[in-house]
Amino acid sequence: MATGGFGCLLLLIREIDLSVKRQI
């Protein structure tokens, strides 16, 4: 359960990082 939550968090961070790079 902990690993699944971590993976979901990592995915969210990656999505935010991509959107930030698109803005720049």
Curated annotation (Swiss-Prot):
- Note whether Secreted occurs among the keywords: yes
Where in the body, by tissue, does this protein show up?
Answer: Expressed in testis.
Q: Which GO terms describe its molecular function?
A: receptor antagonist activity
Provide the GO biological process annotations: negative regulation of execution phase of apoptosis
Q: Name one Pfam family in it.
A: Humanin
The UniProt record describes its induction as: Down-regulated 6 hours following staurosporine (STS) treatment and up-regulated 24 hours following STS treatment. Down-regulated 6 hours following beta-carotene treatment, returning to its basal level 24 hours following beta-carotene treatment.
The entry's keywords:
Cytoplasm, Secreted
Main location (coarse class): secreted
Q: Does the keyword Secreted apply?
A: yes
Purpose: Plays a role as a neuroprotective and antiapoptotic factor.
PANTHER family per UniProt = HUMANIN-LIKE 4 (PTHR33895), HUMANIN-LIKE 7 (PTHR33895:SF2)
In the record, the note on similarity to other proteins reads: Belongs to the humanin family.
* Name of protein: Humanin-like 7
- Which organism does this record belong to? Homo sapiens
